[in-house]
Each structure stands twice: as C-alpha cells, then as structure tokens.
Amino acid sequence: MHRRRFLAGVAGLGAFGVAGCIDDTSAGAPGGTDPTDGVSTPTGTDGPGTPTATPLRTPTMTATPPETPPHDAPFPPGREDVDRVVWYREVSDPAGTTHLSYSTSSLSLPGEISLTLQNNADRQFMTNFYDWALYRWEGGRWRHVAPLFVNQPLMTLEPGESHTWTVTLGDENLETPAFRASGTHEVTVEPVGGGHYAFAVDGWWEDQDETPAHEHEAVYAARFEVEGPQLPLVPSSAVTATRREGDTVVVEAENPRGSDGTPATYVLTRDDAAPGPRELVTEQVYREWPLREALAHADGASEVRVETTTGITPLFGVHEEDNPAVTYDGETFRIGAEEREG
C-alpha cells in the first residue's frame, strides 16, 4: 500500500483553542537516519517476537498532482459560522476592497510565501493573527493542515492597516517526531508535499449589523500552488525498535514530548466496518503522534501497537466510548489505548 493518500482532517481556521502561548517553532528536533539511505532498523520478520534487521522502506516520490480545485468547491470545510468568503483571485479592485494577497502564486519546495491582509474598509476588523489556516486540496475537497492549536487573543486590524504572514513550507526533516506550526508573523509549516494549497484568515467587522458578530464571520483566502514531490509517510526518529508477532506489529517509541508519563500502548486495529472514521491526508498524519508511527508501520498488519508513554488523560486523548477510527489510503482502522506496566 502506498502510504500517501487519506486520513481524516480537522476543519476550521484553527482546530483547537488554547489559553497559553505557542511559539513559532516546531516541537521536537530533526534526527535519526535518512529513510532512503539503506540504514536498517530492528524489526521482526522471521517469526513471532523475533527481532531481525530489515531495510527501512524507501517511499516512491511522485510529481505534484495535476488535480486543480474548482472555484466553487466548499470552503472553508466544516464552517457554519462563515457568511462570506473573499478569494484574492476574485478581487477586481484591491485598492478599494479588504483582501488577502500573496507574494507569489506558486513556489517550489522548500520555499517561502508572504500573505498580507489589507483592511481597506473604514472600520476595525476583529480577528486573531494566530488563527490563520493552511489547507490542502486532495481527494476532491479542502483539508485543514495547520495549525492544530491556536492561541486565542482578540486582535484588531485598523482601517488602512495591513498584517503580513511569511510562511515557510518544507518537505525535509521527515524523521522529526512532532511538528508544531504557530505564529503571527513568521510561520513554518512542514512537512508538506506538492499540490494546491490555500491560506485563510477570518474575523468580523466592528459594529456590523449581524449579532452575535463572531457567528457571522468573513474569511479572506488566497490559493497557490506548491511544486514538489508527494509526501511519503515514514516513521520518526522516536522509534527505537519494532518487532512482528504474527499479524501484529509492535513499535517501541520514546514520546517526543518527554518520557515522564504513564506507560501505555496506542493500538491501531484494522476494521473496515468501523463507523464514522476520520479521513486524513499525509500532511495531517505527521501532526498526530503516535498515530503517525502506527500508520507508518501498518502495511500488511492487522494491528499495530505503539509502546510508549503519555501524559494525557484519557490515555493519548483517546475517548474509546466514541469509537474513534481513521481512514488512510483507503483503509480504515479503529483507535484504542491500554495502560501497561512500566
């Protein structure tokens, strides 16, 4: 199975709100070996519980997909509080219209793009400069990529003023265990693959007629193309060992957020009948740990067990009463969690 396609996304201009500060850097650090250099990692192929050395999988790198989003595609996904979406391509009078512009309509990986929100109205625009959003077009719809967590101050853009985000996109450092994208000016989002993307910000106008105002938001968006290979899904440097026990793959990993926590096992079980799975793309998977490790080892396995630690309650944030499940590359898996002895 070519681990590139779908996994279920989080919609909205900022998936989760948090009260604390979030910095502009990625969590975790690049490390480990390049997955294409032939270095081996312990894994089990000779029998149950027998670790052997096998080469790391070398993913197939393909070109930027030709699929182009139609102009009438629903956007942003999952937002019922949006009254109006203003695309930069639809602005005929930039000098007289509030809009989000870009420095380029296309870039190559790794690359940089600047996006500027210009308030050309005569009143304040109420917004949050942390609450930008990057979307990827894949599988016939827009999918939210970043950020997953958003600081929640209320900010304003005064009449005649502008605000610029400089966004760096990359496809390197794939073995970094955890990725975080945040910031109000300088933003890095990695890893991403080639394709069509959209950057968006939202807010509402001071003294607008609709009330409550925050339930009648305007979204300003710009679409651009990223040229580069498709993103492969590979394990991170947090993985210390793997072994195979029949149809089950066991992955041992160090939690990139620290080892202080409850010893636990993240369980991914193949189940095509699982109800209501989230459908994700690879760019989203890299931002969900340890799901990323489990899916990277799911080829040919009925179950993947990631043995690590977690500081989250419930374990790994898994609410098993909700029967969580994901779909990736056309295959569906149930998600579970078990406490284990340290």
Region annotations inferred by a language model:
Residues 1-342:
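Terminal disorder- and signal-encoded targeting elements
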